[in-house]
Amino acid sequence: MNRKYRKTLIAGNWKMNKTPSETKAFMSELKTILPKGRWCDIALCVPAVCIPTAVRAMRETRVGIGAENCNANASGAYTGEIAANMLLDAGCKYVILGHSERRAMGETDKDVNAKVLTALENGLVPILCVGETLEQRETGITTEWITMQIKAGLNGVAEDKIRKMIIAYEPIWAIGTGKTATPEQAEEVCESIRAVIRKMYGAKIARAISILYGGSMNDKNAYDLLAQPDIDGGLIGGASLVPEKFVKIIEAANQPTI
């Protein structure tokens, strides 16, 4: 697969970590060590309370700020929820949707799809997460399961909108466990994801859509994972909380052979 059709994205997912003051300190350090020149796209998806601080700190950089979730509704009596238009107004570019940790709390494919549609309508770039459990992998239904998640998550997404999306493969069995899919395992699934997109939207769009790997990628294994032809970046958890480790992954993504 010729990667010239696609952008590489290294996106951090902070989950429920860091306060606004810690965010300010992190961004200040990151700016001092962030490589200069033309590099891959970079994003940091941070807790909602940290978004304003992150946006202000990174305004003059190439780092896009994102949220970790949004509500499917534009407004209303949804205590504790945040709408997509609020995130956009706050300065967000990206939003993570369908993460396994959200699905574990009862979020359904239908819920995820509704969030994808509203995020696109409001001009955000959705990072749609899909992935299988260890049991599903061991019983041989990984491709079937992920195909179902993709079709459900993209239901109603028009051809002109799918181009603005990113898909992240996050094997649930590798999230926060220290286990990582081998480069070959990760590539096999990412290749199958691209095949699903090809069937749904055609070869041109399948060539253009970026697919990230999101299962415990770190500064030690990033190069081998990113060298795979259908892996176009990473959705980084723990390693994105340390500026030096995050930058090493960015540097791995920009090696001439990637």
List the predicted regions and their residue ranges.
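Active-site loop-to-helix "anion-binding N-cap" substructures in soluble metabolic enzymes
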Residues: 1-258
